């Protein structure tokens, strides 16, 4: 999307304002896609700052944190997984857009026009509304979106719970804009539209007064994330809630919202979170008789079944009582601290990988990605208290030492190398003993 040096042109002020769509057209006008800064990457420090700020404010106002550690780790893990494809290729949304622009555009609006800027703002938001709506109303699209709704908490970390598959369905809805809007303008607004949706994932902000009429707000988006019957298939807006008001999908927040999927998945394992609904579709597709019914399994709503309306029956959605207890890990606090520590180590190498992709060999890049995936899976197993978690963690720590020894994982601070070797050696010994104990006792065979 951009040239390597472009992100350095984004100031701290711009990075923060981009998250609230408070940028001037004149400061975000670029002639080519390569000039467009990576606003999302530049916003990473603000993500962290606002998550911590929300945590502090929640402690002050409610006397408790805004979420749970296990759920937050799973949400951030989903965000980590969703970014991995970008190590190899540009976003499909932008790639497909550029292709249509270069081959099929009908006219060319000026890239430096204020009118083009605002028209693109409306066009991208309108496209997002219809993508988001279809992501809830078409089962195969829902499989590429449901990961975002799987959290039973609602806080800023939930915003990071993104699907690795979503961009492979969303690109279609922006293609009409490519007939006349330059890719550089689109590349700016597709990022701003995403960034705006970060801060609305919070319970701290109750209402924004008159702005509730026009903008998508935390209150409106809380409804969207609810599994109460009145919340289902409502408030699809990205930035402007007017689309929901126009097309009849608006619902105001009027009772306690219970968050998550209508049928909670009960796991913190990141790839189960990402792909469990695809497995459900696969099973349902092959067990449903008739070509027409099989077609409906894919392209009607997630709640559809033979003899039911396209989006299913609302009375089949489980009632909520307000007493629902979110799925939580039974792991000890010490083990949770351990998972946070291992996650932090992984995240440091993850960010360093993105910063230095151009100078890393393909072998190193692939080995690192495998390590990242294994780390997130192992953390999920530990939080789920799976019987094979100790064995997986033993192998993961051994893999780290191997990659470290052969130079595929080098800490930014060279003096930490010895500390890492000691720490991971101790981890191998601990988890290795646990694995042997489980193997000899027979508990390893349990799920």
From Swiss-Prot:
Glyceryl-ether monooxygenase that cleaves the O-alkyl bond of ether lipids. Ether lipids are essential components of brain membranes. A motif (Histidine box-1) lies at residues 132-136. Disulfide bonds: none annotated. A motif (Histidine box-3) lies at residues 221-225. This is Alkylglycerol monooxygenase. GO terms for biological process: ether lipid metabolic process; membrane lipid metabolic process; triglyceride biosynthetic process. It catalyses: 1-O-(1,2-saturated-alkyl)-sn-glycerol + (6R)-L-erythro-5,6,7,8-tetrahydrobiopterin + O2 = a 1-(1-hydroxyalkyl)-sn-glycerol + (6R)-L-erythro-6,7-dihydrobiopterin + H2O. InterPro entries: AGMP_C (IPR056853), Fatty_acid_hydroxylase (IPR006694), Sterol_desaturase/TMEM195 (IPR051689). Its EC number is 1.14.16.5. Residues 119-249 form the Fatty acid hydroxylase domain. It is found in: Endoplasmic reticulum membrane. The chain crosses the membrane at residues 43-63, 111-131, 170-190, 340-360, 363-383, 413-433. Highly expressed in lever and small intestine. Its cofactor is Fe cation. Belongs to the sterol desaturase family. TMEM195 subfamily. The lineage of its organism: Eukaryota, Metazoa, Chordata, Craniata, Vertebrata.
């Amino acid at each position: 999307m951009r040239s390597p040096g472009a992100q350095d042109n984004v100031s701290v002020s711009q990075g923060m304002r981009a998250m609230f769509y408070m940028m001037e057209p004149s400061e975000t006008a670029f002639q080519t896609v390569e000039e467009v800064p990576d606003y999302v990457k530049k916003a990473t420090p603000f993500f962290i700052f606002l998550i911590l700020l929300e945590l502090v404010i929640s402690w002050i106002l409610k006397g408790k944190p805004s979420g749970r550690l296990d759920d937050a780790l799973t949400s951030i893990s989903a965000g980590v997984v969703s970014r991995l494809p970008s190590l190899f290729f540009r976003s499909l949304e932008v790639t497909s857009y550029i292709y249509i622009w270069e081959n099929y555009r009908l006219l060319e609006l000026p890239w430096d026009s204020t009118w083009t800027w605002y028209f693109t703002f409306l066009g991208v938001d309108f496209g997002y509304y219809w993508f988001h709506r279809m992501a809830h109303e078409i089962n195969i699209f829902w499989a590429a979106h449901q990961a975002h709704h799987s959290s039973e908490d609602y806080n800023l970390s939930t915003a990071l719970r993104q699907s690795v598959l979503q961009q492979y369905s969303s690109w279609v809805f922006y293609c009409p804009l490519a007939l006349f809007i330059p890719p550089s303008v689109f590349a700016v607004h597709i990022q701003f539209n995403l960034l705006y949706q970060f801060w609305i994932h919070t319970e701290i902000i109750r209402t924004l007064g008159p702005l509730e009429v026009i903008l998508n707000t935390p209150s409106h988006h809380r409804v969207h994330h609810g599994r109460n019957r009145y919340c289902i298939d409502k408030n699809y807006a990205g930035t402007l809630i007017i689309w929901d008001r126009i097309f009849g999908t608006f619902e105001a927040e009027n009772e306690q919202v219970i968050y998550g999927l209508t049928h909670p998945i009960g796991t913190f394992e990141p790839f189960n979170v990402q792909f469990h609904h695809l497995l459900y579709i696969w099973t349902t597709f092959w067990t449903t008789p008739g070509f027409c019914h099989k077609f409906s399994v894919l392209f009607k709503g997630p709640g559809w079944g033979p003899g039911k309306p396209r989006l299913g029956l609302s009375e089949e959605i489980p009632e909520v009582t307000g007493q629902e207890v979110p799925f939580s890990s039974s792991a000890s606090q010490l083990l949770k601290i351990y998972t946070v520590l291992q996650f932090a180590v992984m995240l440091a190498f993850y960010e360093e990988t993105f910063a230095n992709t151009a100078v890393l060999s393909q072998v190193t890049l692939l080995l690192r990605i495998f390590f990242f995936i294994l780390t997130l899976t192992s953390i999920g197993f530990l939080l789920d208290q799976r019987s094979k978690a100790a064995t997986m963690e033993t192998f993961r720590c051994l893999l780290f030492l191997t990659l470290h020894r052969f130079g595929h994982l080098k800490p930014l601070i060279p003096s930490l190398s010895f500390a890492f070797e000691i720490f991971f050696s101790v981890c191998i010994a601990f988890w290795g003993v646990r694995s042997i104990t489980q193997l000899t006792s027979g508990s390893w065979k349990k799920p």
